[in-house]
Amino acid sequence: MPPKVKFSKEAMIGTALQLVREEGIASLTARALAEKLGATPRVIFGQFTNMAELQAEVIVAAEMVVVEYIRKALEDEKPFRSVGVASILFASKEPQLFQLLFQNPSKDPIRRFQDFLPMKDHSYQLVLDSIVADYPLTVEEAGRLYQHLFIYSHGMASMVASGIYQFGMEEVIGLLTEVCQSLIKEMVGKK
């Protein structure tokens, strides 16, 4: 009779995610995770074929953390602006997860930037819908606006996650609003 599984796959992923939150993806080793679980590395390999499989699950779990930040932002009175603020807040509160998701070399680089957001952002369509609902833009223009603001807010978030500069909330809102309004004015003016 095989030994009873003491730790579920989900519990291991949750503990691994916490380890990565605290110390970064490089700290996610079988030994470190086993120590956190109070077990031996053998327990991990009873649930996962190898560490690459576990790391892939941790990345999915980290993506769900971002999705939750964006979901909450989309409930705000000014959802699109709040999405930009949320990404910077995520970088501030979860710098290791931000670096894992957005600052590591990709195994599968994207060839055209316009493909990036639809592929990487689980809330892409919801964000586009919020832009079209709040601004006099077409879906195509909303996609371009989101692309521009993503690049801008990603730069700010990268500065925050790497510890270069910690933007204040008023500063973030002011900068994002100014850029967003300028882009919308430019797009609407071309019609």
Walk through the language-model features, giving the residues of each:
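N-terminal intrinsically disordered/low-complexity leader segments
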Residues: 1-7, 190-191
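Amphipathic alpha-helical packing segments from all-alpha helical-bundle domains
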Residues: 110-136, 143-147, 174-185
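Hydrophobic alpha-helical connector segments
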Residues: 57, 70-97, 139, 145-149
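Short secondary-structure transition hinges
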Residues: 89, 96-126, 158, 162, ...
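Amphipathic C-terminal alpha-helical segment
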Residues: 100, 150-168, 182-191
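Alpha-helical structural segments
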Residues: 11-18, 22, 53-72, 82, ...
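Helix-turn-helix
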Residues: 11, 19-53, 57
